[in-house]
Amino acid sequence: MSLWRQTPDLEQLNASQKNSIGDLLGIRFEAFDDESLTASMPVDSRTHQPFGLLHGGASVVLAESLGSMASYLCVDTSQYYCVGLEVNANHLRGLRSGRVTAVARAIHLGRTTHVWDIRLSGDDGKPSCIARLTMAVVPLAGMAGRAG
């Protein structure tokens, strides 16, 4: 049984990245199955740190972008939205080029929080980073009367 409340539409997910950090870094949603969502980004000058390796912060942006979208696809968006509460990452090895691919899998899908395990790897399939993302599931009604 699928965990998705909305069936992922990869074209629509990619279009949603326009004019965001995901667009700037070249993040692309690539695949999904009943239990996971996959995205990738290039390892290039946009995502390098000064020594030519993938910047750890760029890995975290990929992880949080992927996990946030996964949470969004698991809720009734007419009643709820999702925001990040906490993200942590263990950087396992450096990448210099190619693409880094991330796969998000749910650890916990509760009424008010979601927790995601996000595994990043290089083109060779070897792990480069393991991230955990906690998302808050917030009622849209809670937005009424709030100023931006």
What would you call each of these model-derived segments?
Residues 1-148:
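Terminal targeting signals and extreme-terminal segments of soluble enzymes
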